[in-house]
């Protein structure tokens, strides 16, 4: 049982270090959530998805977004990709 606990602890630590390393390399504005905003517009935009490690398309409503909001894929990749 002691060996299982140690193995589990090592897995958790490795995962935590991997997430920390990726987060440290990505600019802080790219770690923000993909905010659709509160308005009802329909604007295709791109934002960095920290869990997927890449830029993805989402729909922006037109207001109350954040800095993780780019007009095209290239803009997002230039700003956020590591």
From Swiss-Prot:
Keywords: Disulfide bond, Hemostasis impairing toxin, Protease inhibitor, Secreted, Serine protease inhibitor, Signal, Toxin. GO terms for molecular function: serine-type endopeptidase inhibitor activity; toxin activity. Its main location: secreted. Expressed by the venom gland. Residues 1-24 form the signal peptide. It comes from the Eukaryota. The record marks 40-41 as: Reactive bond for trypsin. InterPro entries: Kunitz_BPTI (IPR002223), Kunitz_BPTI_sf (IPR036880), Prtase_inh_Kunz-CS (IPR020901), TFPI/VKTCI-like (IPR050098). GO terms for cellular component: extracellular space. Residues 30-80 form the BPTI/Kunitz inhibitor domain. Pfam families: Kunitz_BPTI (PF00014). It is found in: Secreted. Negative results: does not inhibit factor Xa, thrombin, and tissue plasminogen activator (t-PA). Serine protease inhibitor that inhibits plasmin (IC(50)=43.53 nM, Ki=3.6 nM), thereby acting as an antifibrinolytic agent. May act in a cooperative manner with the serine protease Bi-VSP (AC B5U2W0) to promote the spread of bee venom under anti-bleeding conditions. This is Kunitz-type serine protease inhibitor Bi-KTI. It comes from Bombus ignitus.
